[in-house]
A protein has these predicted regions:
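Bateman (tandem CBS) regulatory domains
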Residues: 1-4, 57-67
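The conserved cystathionine-beta-synthase
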Residues: 5-24, 30-31, 49, 70-89, ...
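Short beta->alpha transition motifs characteristic of CBS
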Residues: 21, 28, 36-50, 93, ...
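Phosphate-interaction motifs
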Residues: 24-25, 36, 51-59, 75
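N-terminal glycine-rich phosphate-binding loop and ensuing alpha1 helix
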Residues: 118-122
Length: 122
């Protein structure tokens, strides 16, 4: 998962390359001390470019600074599933009490068993 964690001082081009390489739809932005700063989706990048941003511009003006997060030890699997299905999230950052990134929940990890059951029925 480290391949989708980036610092806020990268360019839009670098973010696009990271998304492309990772195969994800969203990146997690954290500082050098692993404090969560936000998320940046492929949609955020499209909106930035449509507003006139260049691929050489830095992402700090375009990422979501108040993303949906779950707090370590304070959420249930059902809550995570509801967030994923209601908001079509690709991932949800999990932070500790100090706001440091402790995990990243990925859609396919949460719904792995559901997909297996569906494939068996088909």
């Amino acid at each position: 998962m480290k391949d989708i964690i980036v610092q806020p001082n990268i360019t839009i081009r670098q973010a696009m390359k990271t998304l492309n390489t990772s195969g994800r739809k969203c990146l997690v932005i954290a500082d050098g001390k692993n404090k969560l700063l936000g998320t940046l989706s492929d949609g955020d990048l499209r909106k930035a470019i449509l507003k006139g941003a260049g691929v050489g511009d830095f992402i700090h003006d375009y990422y979501q600074k108040k993303p949906t997060v779950l707090v370590e030890g304070q959420y249930r699997l059902g809550e995570a599933k509801k967030l994923f299905t209601n908001y079509k999230f690709d991932l949800i950052p999990v932070v500790d009490d100090e706001g440091k990134l402790s995990d990243i929940l990925l859609w396919e990890r949460i719904f792995k068993n559901a997909n297996s059951k569906l494939n068996k029925k088909l």
